[in-house]
Amino acid sequence: MSHFALVAPPYPSHFAAMQALGGELVERGHQVSFFHQPEAERWLSDSRLGFVAIGHAECPPGSLDLAMRRVADPAGPLRPRRLIKQLAHTTGMLISNLPQALRDHRVDAVI
């Protein structure tokens, strides 16, 4: 069967939705792996799904918690700017690291 890579914004709700999809793919006989910054692995609870940590240099320990605190802060007009900046950083990390990781892990399709 195929090896599917799951890539989502670094938010628990997005990971939960993708994890449900990944579980269904595993039930159908596929291999499924999340690809993201190391700290995002904590949001996975389905042991059937793999996790490939990428972006170690761009996302050092503590960076995900800091990003979550900044995005969750409802105060002021800068919240949308912080969200966009955080997503741009994540996108840059994925663009830099994901292609090689997908090749290394012989991924057939990306969701």
Residue ranges and their predicted role:
Residues 1-111:
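Glycosyltransferase specificity loop/lid
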